């Protein structure tokens, strides 16, 4: 019996897993074997009847699908609307619970991730356009029975506490919650514990991602030039409970708001054997939930 967050569900964003359609059964069996109850699915997977059948066989739920919004400093690129609509159509067919919006990555912010105030900034009008874009497609998702949240993300135009606040204040809180990715929040200079207190029940989805202090400091100093290199070559993100994240304190704070959504373990890349990192994360998460 869990002492903390008894209604919350544990899933995985399996970026550190190597998916091939020819081994989907093995892939899903491995995820289920670690005890994960849900996953982030891709558009390809959402559109595959065979994959959805295998998910049901392994009792894995389509917890979320990610929707990246291409942006300039003046807001979303209008040509991306058809892609967003397609993502929602596939998510609906797959029975996805949560649509996770985020601004797509950009090379200019990749070079200043973690020190975003020194980089290019989205304009006030751009924030307003982005808010309307998210609301438009969150409404479409709601019509299809899908919840929505927005994910502040390092190396994008919405990374920091300030940028998140500006955007979220312009978005209908009944329509779009906050997806708190604690790893990206740390990279952006924020404190996840404070974020829980600041946003409270507006946090409807959580990505559990931990951060290597050593790699982060090298990225902030410029020794590692971009976040992409920090993630892919130096493994900026580490298994939950092994880095800067105060995992137990996070769960204590979420408990104050009776959080009952998904806790999604995520590690963008990991040292081999990369899939084993997810096993470390879920065991540390379970221990912190006691």
Task: Name what the model sees in each region.
Residues 260-288:
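C-terminal/domain-terminus segments
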Residues 18-22, 38-51, 70-82, 154-160, ...:
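Acidic-and-aromatic substrate-binding clefts and catalytic sites of carbohydrate-active enzymes
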Residues 242-256:
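A short, acidic, amphipathic alpha-helical segment used as a generic capping/interface helix at domain edges
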Residues 40, 64, 100, 149, ...:
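Conserved beta-strand positions in the central sheet of alpha/beta enzyme cores
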Residues 78-178:
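Active-site acidic/histidine proton-transfer and metal-coordination neighborhood
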Residues 1-98, 124, 132, 142, ...:
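N-terminal pre-domain/capping segments
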Residues 132-238, 244:
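Acidic/histidine-rich catalytic cores of soluble enzymes
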């Amino acid at each position: 019996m869990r002492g903390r967050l008894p209604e919350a569900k544990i899933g995985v964003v399996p970026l550190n897993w190597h998916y091939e359609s020819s081994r989907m059964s093995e892939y899903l069996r491995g995820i289920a074997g670690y005890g994960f109850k849900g996953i982030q699915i891709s558009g390809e997977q959402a559109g595959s009847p065979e994959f959805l059948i295998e998910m049901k066989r392994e009792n894995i739920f389509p917890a979320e699908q990610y929707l990246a919004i291409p942006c300039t400093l003046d807001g979303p690129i209008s040509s991306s609307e058809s892609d967003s609509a397609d993502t929602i159509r596939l998510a609906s067919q797959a029975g996805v619970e949560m649509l996770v919006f985020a601004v797509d990555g950009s090379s200019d912010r990749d070079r200043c991730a973690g020190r975003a105030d020194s980089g290019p900034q989205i304009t006030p009008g751009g924030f307003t356009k982005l808010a309307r874009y998210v609301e438009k497609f969150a409404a479409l998702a709601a019509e299809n029975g899908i919840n929505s949240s927005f994910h502040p993300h390092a190396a994008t135009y919405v990374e920091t506490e300030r940028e998140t606040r500006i955007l979220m204040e312009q978005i209908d809180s009944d329509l779009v919650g906050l997806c708190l990715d604690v790893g990206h929040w740390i990279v952006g200079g924020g404190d996840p514990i404070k974020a829980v207190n600041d946003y409270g029940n507006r946090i409807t989805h959580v990505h559990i991602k931990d951060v290597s202090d050593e790699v982060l400091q090298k990225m902030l100093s410029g020794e590692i030039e971009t976040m992409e290199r920090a993630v892919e070559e130096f493994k900026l993100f580490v298994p939950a409970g092994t880095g800067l994240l105060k995992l137990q304190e996070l769960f204590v704070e979420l408990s104050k708001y009776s959080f009952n959504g998904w806790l999604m373990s995520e590690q963008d890349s990991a040292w081999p054997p990369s899939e084993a990192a997810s096993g470390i994360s879920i065991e540390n998460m379970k221990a912190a939930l006691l």
